[in-house]
């Protein structure tokens, strides 16, 4: 068979003398044996095929990419001189493999590290300009979660790419974008709770803010922050409650990303839509209050 080298798990080490004697009995030249350390669970127990969460299908359904999984299972055993903050493709791993750096002790799989590797993979795809696959996956995830409340027109490639660049340090799997923390990216808030926000004239503030945003030529985080500060001063409203109020109007969140971040990732057009939507809600509230009184 002309086999010169055998690499196998360390559990075969005790059987090696028997195998060598068999070769000797037949007068054959034995191959060179190397015994590799086992890959264990994070708690030190052995991996088992009876574990439901150890199958590749499980990880794929969870939204992990094959390159992230590949790096995840190669790191614990060694053999690769690469940093922890990079994800390499299979052909790249083949080129740098060095058996002399294989570890002697068993390695452990840390699920948190898989999340980090998956995040790094997403970041690499973005850095390499390979975003078509990512945006198409996000489109399917969001349409599946919010079908009936959102249309494909709301999920343009340009908008999804903008979101990916913004959230690449915030997520490790694309399906997280369908979670409650990121719902504001897809849906307008259906109610605005300003009961604990010190804003006495919400409708006037919103109308002023709409005009301010409409007149902005440059729409980046720095410019937005600067203009909102000026507008708060013009309206004689304290800056902190003013920004809390705008965050609530734009996202429905009491806490979360800054107003500058939210406006920038939504873009000027969607920001104006949200502010006008919030203005309608506030106007209806004021109308009901006048009627009741």
Residue locations for each model-derived region?
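Glycine- and acidic
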Residues: 1-6, 54, 209, 227-229, ...
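Catalytic adenosine-cofactor/nucleotide-binding cores of aminoacyl-tRNA synthetases and other
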Residues: 14, 24-191, 251-292
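Basic, amphipathic alpha-helix used for nucleic-acid engagement in HTH/winged-helix/SANT-Myb modules
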Residues: 193-195
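C-terminal accessory/binding modules appended to enzymatic or scaffolding proteins
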Residues: 197-250
């Amino acid at each position: 068979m002309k086999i010169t080298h055998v690499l196998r798990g360390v559990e075969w080490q005790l059987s090696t003398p028997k195998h060598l004697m068999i070769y000797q009995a037949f007068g054959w030249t034995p191959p060179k044996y190397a015994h590799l350390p086992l890959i264990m669970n994070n708690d030190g127990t052995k991996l088992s095929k009876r574990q439901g969460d150890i199958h590749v299908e499980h990880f794929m359904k969870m939204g992990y990419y094959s390159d992230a999984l590949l790096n995840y299972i190669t790191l614990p055993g060694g053999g690769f001189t690469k940093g922890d903050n990079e994800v390499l493709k299979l052909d790249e791993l083949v080129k740098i493999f060095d058996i002399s750096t294989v570890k002697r002790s068993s390695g452990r799989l840390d699920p948190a590290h898989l999340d980090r590797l998956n995040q790094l993979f997403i970041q690499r795809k973005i850095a390499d300009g390979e975003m078509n696959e990512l945006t198409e996956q996000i489109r399917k995830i969001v349409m599946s979660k919010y079908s009936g409340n959102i249309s494909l027109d709301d999920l343009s490639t340009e908008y999804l790419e903008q979101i990916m660049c913004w959230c690449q340090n915030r997520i490790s799997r694309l399906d997280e974008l369908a979670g409650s923390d990121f719902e504001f990216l897809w849906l307008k808030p259906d109610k605005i709770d300003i009961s604990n926000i010190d804003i006495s004239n919400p409708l006037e503030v919103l109308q002023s803010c709409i005009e301010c945003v409409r007149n902005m030529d440059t729409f980046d985080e720095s410019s937005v922050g600067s203009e909102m500060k000026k507008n708060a001063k013009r309206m004689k409203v304290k800056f902190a409650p003013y920004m809390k109020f705008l965050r609530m109007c734009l996202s429905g969140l009491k806490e979360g990303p800054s107003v500058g971040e939210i406006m920038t990732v939504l873009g000027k057009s969607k920001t104006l839509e949200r502010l006008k939507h919030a203005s309608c809600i506030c106007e209806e509230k004021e109308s009901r209050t006048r009627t009741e009184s």
